[in-house]
Amino acid sequence: GVTATTVSRVINNRGYISEGTRKKVYAAMEEMHYQPNELARAFSKQYTNTIGLIVPHISHPFFIKVISNLESSAAEKGFKLLLCNSKEQPEKEQDYLDMCISNRVAGIVLCSKYVQTREFRKMNIPVVNLERGGDDDTISVQCDNYQGGKLAAEHLIECGCKNLLHFGGVAGKDMPADRRADGFLRVCRER
């Protein structure tokens, strides 16, 4: 047998453990179908290896790609995603944020125009705003939608297309697609 401290050192890869002891511990873990207790680990670290991802529409093609790529990148680094679909409802977003806090997430990727991220800095929870402007100190990742619209129209014109038509966005609702439409229409008017 070995002590609980030795098992802990093997699992957490801390301190010197001989190769023989390490193999012995792993063999016993496999035989017993042992799974580390993530809650206990989170208690000592004060966070889990989970990243909260809050998106407004889980079925939108843009967010489908974002979810897939973030999940792959997180998995490579040993993290899991906690996926939340807010349906652009501020109260739902707040509920999800509270859930992320109570679940001790390591960070939050947030696509919201309603939530102010200052409170998370006070709690030392890293937040990245995606496709929405954030507070001054918050990391924000945004597409240049205007330029994207221009590039799309220019490409179609260069391919010989005429009488271009643009579909996108929701009438009366401020959306990133509006900026793409502006860029698209500018190129169409100039040519």
Region roles according to the model:
Residues 72-118:
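Central regulatory/effector-binding core of bacterial HTH transcription factors
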Residues 1-49:
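N-terminal helix-turn-helix DNA-binding module of bacterial transcription factors
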Residues 118-124:
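Acidic (Asp/Glu)-rich catalytic clusters
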